[in-house]
Each structure stands twice: as C-alpha cells, then as structure tokens.
Amino acid sequence: MAPTPPAPLTVEKIRADVADCLGEDPADIPVDENLVDHGLDSVRVMALLERWRREHGVTAGFADLAERPAIEAWAPLLGAV
C-alpha cells in the first residue's frame, strides 16, 4: 500500500501556523502585510518551513520566503490551495 501524500497547505493553515508561532490570533495576522512587522524573524521562518516540509511536502527554500515575508506571497511558493 502506497503512503498517503501529504495534504496541501491552505492560506488559512499558513496564517494559523504563523499566528501560532507568534503567539497571536490568526485574525490579527493580515495576509498582505510584511510578517517581520508582526514579529516574525528568520529563526521562526526556518521553524515554519521545516514544519511545512515535514507535514506538507513543501519544497520552497528559506530565501524564497525571506525575500517576501507575507502570507499572500508565500501561498504560491508553498503550493497552497
């Protein structure tokens, strides 16, 4: 029996994971704003990326996410549906 492929990320899951990482409510994290302005740093980006690689099979690199730290910019890079 073949292993089940990982579930794709959604914009809401990305938002929820970022909010969890920052100790915030997802409703307080806008999808179109720079996440650095909300306290996201490189260590947290790496932690999120490793989690998404493990749980969702994401292949994006750190530099891709660091270049434009906003959920709406990350969604296509992370294969969000």
What role is predicted for each listed range?
Residues 2-81:
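Phosphopantetheine-dependent thiolation modules in NRPS/PKS and related acyl-activating systems
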